């Protein structure tokens, strides 16, 4: 779409749009979400980013506000597997067949008309899933007792309800807004565009002043993976 320079036509919420893509910026999805909580990047020298999606849980360590790409790792422990396991356990113990919506509501602590027995099974399995996730993360080489973890994505709310003090985690931060990635992308792009404009303005300044300003601009971009420009 970027190479063709041709207009793109689409409909969103009943409104027709016609756009031309002029520039593309790429950010790691979970890392972009941290743009909504920039204080986390400034306060912690290292943290683990855990994006709990439908099929996978994507892990990546952040060191000094920069994603450590060589630590990226995916676990096949997404929420689809969690829901499927719960459905099978409920069927095995009670003979009932729950829907995805029922299971997801109970995992999120929302109302659902079921027996206490079924609810207990769902909560027990939610805790089991959380324990399995923590164990798999540790086995992947991330010491959750030593570094803070930032959790986001659809499964983050499930883990937030089933953690226990006995897990002994260093620190957990939950980004539960389902729009957090979209907001993060918007803020990251705005910041990068601002930095580019500042660097461009250097060429319009006297040489000595421009060199100093350019160094400052480049130093500030490290929060965006160190290779924004």
Regions found by a protein language model. Name each.
Residues 57-61:
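Short beta-strand scaffold segments in enzyme catalytic cores
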């Amino acid at each position: 779409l970027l190479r063709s320079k041709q207009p793109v036509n689409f409909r969103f919420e009943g409104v027709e749009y016609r756009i031309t893509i002029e520039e593309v910026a790429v950010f790691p999805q979970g890392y972009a979400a941290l743009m909504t909580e920039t204080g986390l990047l400034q306060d912690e020298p290292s943290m683990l980013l855990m994006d709990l999606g439908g099929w996978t849980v994507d892990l990546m360590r952040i060191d000094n506000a920069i994603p450590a790409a060589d630590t990226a790792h995916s676990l096949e422990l997404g929420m689809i597997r969690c829901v499927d396991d719960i459905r099978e356990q409920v069927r095995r113990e009670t003979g009932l067949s729950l829907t995805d919506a029922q299971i997801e509501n109970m995992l999120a602590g929302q109302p659902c008309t079921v027996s206490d027995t079924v609810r207990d099974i769902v909560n027990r399995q939610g805790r089991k899933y959380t324990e399995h996730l923590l164990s798999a993360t540790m086995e992947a080489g991330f010491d959750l007792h030593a570094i803070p973890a930032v959790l986001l994505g659809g499964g983050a709310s499930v883990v937030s309800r089933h953690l226990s003090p006995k897990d002994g985690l260093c620190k957990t931060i939950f980004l539960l807004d389902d729009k957090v990635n979209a907001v993060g992308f918007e803020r990251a792009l705005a910041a990068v565009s601002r930095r580019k404009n500042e660097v461009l303005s250097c060429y319009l300044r006297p040489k000595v002043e421009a060199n100093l300003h350019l160094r400052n601009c480049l130093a500030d971009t490290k929060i965006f993976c160190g290779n924004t420009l």
